[in-house]
Curated annotation (Swiss-Prot):
UniProt-listed HAMAP family: NrdR
BP GO terms, sorted: negative regulation of DNA-templated transcription
Record keyword Ribosomal protein present: no
PROSITE patterns: ATP_CONE
Family: Belongs to the NrdR family.
Keywords from the named record: ATP-binding, DNA-binding, Metal-binding, Nucleotide-binding, Repressor, Transcription, Transcription regulation, Zinc, Zinc-finger
Gene assigned in the entry: nrdR
Pfam families xrefs: ATP-cone (PF03477), Zn_ribbon_NrdR (PF22811)
Name of the protein described by the UniProt record: Transcriptional repressor NrdR
GO molecular function annotation: ATP binding; DNA binding; zinc ion binding
Superkingdom of origin organism: Bacteria
Cofactor note: Binds 1 zinc ion.
Species this chain originates from: Nitrosomonas eutropha (strain DSM 101675 / C91 / Nm57)
Length: 160
């Protein structure tokens, strides 16, 4: 690795440590030419699949959109942050674990609905109202009836 101070090509690793979360390696390096030390970080490059929107155009996966969807649906709901993070992590693992290079936004939306249903029924209904484009009160009432009719369990799948 090139020294950031003198530009020399030859540096040596003095110390390596794995970060607390285990996702990065911190390396202390020393330049063999000027003797100065510097730190580098090594991380895994993760490539999420392209998202195919309903209109057919393709966009890069945006992790922030996923977080925002959960935040809006769960706004002022009594759901611990750790549970929300775990739900988002499950969706990210599905995205990476499937090995697909492309995935439809509809599939991701369904995964979000499944996770919200497990976390909080009100948040599920909020998200469903936007995701399914509810047009009147009847649409809300129908989903509420479906939610009320299904047994309550952490492993529930959303109705319909």
């Amino acid at each position: 690795m090139r020294c950031p101070f003198c530009g020399a090509e030859d540096t040596s690793v003095v110390d390596s440590r794995v970060s607390e979360e285990g996702s990065r390696i911190r390396r202390r390096r020393q330049c063999t030419a000027c003797g100065k030390r510097f730190t580098t970080y090594e991380t895994v490059e993760v490539r999420f699949p392209q998202i195919i929107k309903q209109g057919g155009n393709r966009v890069e996966f945006n992790r922030e959109k996923l977080y925002t969807s959960f935040a809006r649906a769960l706004h002022k709901r009594p759901v611990p942050v750790g549970q929300v993070d775990a739900a988002i992590e499950r969706i990210l693992q599905k995205l990476l674990g499937g090995g697909a290079q492309e995935i439809s936004s509809r599939t991701i939306g369904e995964w979000v609905m499944q996770e919200l249903y497990k976390l909080d029924k009100v948040a599920y209904i909020r998200f469903a109202s936007v995701y399914r484009s509810f047009e009147d009160v009847g649409d809300f009432q129908e989903v509420i009836r479906e939610v009320q009719a299904s047994p309550s369990s952490l492993d529930d799948e959303p109705p319909g």
